């Protein structure tokens, strides 16, 4: 089954456009604002939206997204409430939606129950940053019966390991631009171009760069070596900046509009 993610990325490729993928933590600062943020980001030009399921111990996340997770948990965000949020969103939009979720959350919910629920509500893909390679293979087999993509994260590592991770990948490959946790950076890994070229020899799946992408200058430097960009911590910072005067949605919308304009000019 071809997912909405694949359809969207194929359509962008036909027009020689890069994918603009944005991330928000579901429930930060509350579920109502997340609802508004998703619709505003789509209107501003986002092609795919990642919804992070808040978790108390997010190992791959830097301080910005950790704070977002804590705000969401404090506001009462939980799995069922987030599922309800997606149901409401699906009444308004068909934009591809991806859950970024830690494996422990999925395991506690029950793997098959979680997948069934995701399919019912219209989730198009899963990113599980702490999923071991061995469990990944089992999950890939299970997910063949669902119209959802299991999206791998790949960082510069051994050739054999990279080949194994991208084998049978679907949707897109989440290419980690720098070591460490998520967050804005002033510079990215030195040999990012070599890493991307190497990955391209292993797979034809779209390569999307994340971890540290925060502005159009970075996008400009990377546009020739990837098929899209994931903007996460920079979006959360706009949300944070607008908490006091409730301008988060407006700030995020303007930020995404600028990136979208640049993406199309570039």
Swiss-Prot record:
Q: Under which main EC class is this enzyme filed?
A: lyase
Keyword Lyase present in the record's keywords: the answer is yes
Q: A single Pfam family, by name? A: Trp_syntA
Q: Does the keyword Cell inner membrane apply?
A: no
Q: Which reaction does it catalyse?
A: (1S,2R)-1-C-(indol-3-yl)glycerol 3-phosphate + L-serine = D-glyceraldehyde 3-phosphate + L-tryptophan + H2O
Q: In which pathway does it act?
A: Amino-acid biosynthesis; L-tryptophan biosynthesis; L-tryptophan from chorismate: step 5/5
Q: Which UniProt keywords apply?
A: Amino-acid biosynthesis, Aromatic amino acid biosynthesis, Lyase, Tryptophan biosynthesis
Xref: PANTHER family: TRYPTOPHAN SYNTHASE ALPHA CHAIN, CHLOROPLASTIC (PTHR43406:SF1), TRYPTOPHAN SYNTHASE, ALPHA CHAIN (PTHR43406)
What does this protein do, in the record's words?
A: The alpha subunit is responsible for the aldol cleavage of indoleglycerol phosphate to indole and glyceraldehyde 3-phosphate.
**The protein, known as:** Tryptophan synthase alpha chain
Q: Which organism is it from?
A: Alkaliphilus metalliredigens (strain QYMF)
What gene name does this entry carry?
A: trpA
């Amino acid at each position: 089954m071809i997912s909405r993610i694949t359809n969207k990325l194929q359509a962008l490729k036909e027009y020689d456009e890069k994918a603009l993928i944005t991330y928000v933590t579901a429930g930060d600062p509350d579920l109502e604002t997340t609802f508004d943020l998703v619709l505003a980001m789509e209107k501003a030009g986002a092609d795919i939206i990642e919804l992070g399921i808040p978790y108390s111990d997010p190992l791959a996340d830097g301080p910005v997204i950790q704070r977002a997770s804590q705000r969401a948990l404090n506001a009462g965000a939980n799995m069922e409430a987030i599922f309800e949020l997606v149901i409401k969103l699906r009444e308004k939009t068909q934009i591809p939606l991806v859950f970024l979720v830690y494996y422990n959350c999925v395991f506690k919910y029950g793997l098959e129950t979680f997948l069934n629920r995701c399919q019912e509500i219209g989730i198009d893909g899963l990113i599980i940053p702490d999923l071991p390679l061995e469990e990944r293979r089992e999950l890939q087999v299970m997910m063949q019966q669902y119209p959802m993509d299991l999206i791998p994260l790949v960082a510069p590592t051994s050739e054999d390991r990279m080949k194994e991770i991208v084998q049978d990948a679907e949707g897109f490959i989440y290419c980690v631009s720098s070591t460490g946790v998520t967050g804005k950076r002033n510079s990215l890994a030195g040999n990012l171009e070599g890493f991307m070229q190497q990955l391209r020899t292993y797979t034809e799946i779209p390569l999307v760069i994340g971890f540290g992408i925060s502005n159009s200058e970075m996008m400009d430097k990377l546009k020739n070596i990837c098929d899209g960009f994931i903007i996460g911590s920079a979006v959360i910072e706009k949300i944070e900046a607008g908490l006091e005067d409730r301008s988060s949605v407006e700030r995020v919308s303007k930020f995404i509009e600028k990136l979208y304009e640049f993406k199309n000019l570039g």
